[in-house]
Amino acid sequence: PGKEQAADTARRAAQLLLMQEAVVLMRDDLKESCYVEGVQYLPLEECLSRTDVILTIGGDGTILHEANFTLQYQKPILGINIGRCGFLATCEVDEMEEKLAALVRGEYMLDSRMLLYVRLLGEDGWEGHALNDVVVTKGRLQQAIDFSIYCDDILVELSLIHI
């Protein structure tokens, strides 16, 4: 999906929510590409702290990115799918009017997902969060990877995998 399709979908979603008398907040960096009269354009952090639900427009990759980015705000995410894969992004564009109206009326169920904390130890260490699963790879080199998996500081699995 292109950026123009995402912008068109964002404008349409904002219009539908405003017609339902919802308060619509949008990141101020989207004002030029997604302007809709009646939307409040604010810094991202203010949008995230004030909103009840975060809307993402894209595919599952967009939701995975936003889930990690918005973790500290503990807000539900509704994904409007304009991508190829819509397992997590459960609202299709042609369902937007119906689903956004139901959202404003409070007629929805939350689907909780497992969020994993991931920490890579070593010289190039990294840490972050993942939604549902983590893929560990060494790249293209044929080599063994030795790793340990912990849950609540208890060793769950110790593995040596040849790639």
Stretches with model-predicted labels:
Residues 161-163:
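Conserved small/polar residues in nucleotide/adenosyl-binding loops
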Residues 2-3, 60-62, 85:
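Short glycine-rich anion-binding loops that position phosphate/pyrophosphate groups of nucleotides
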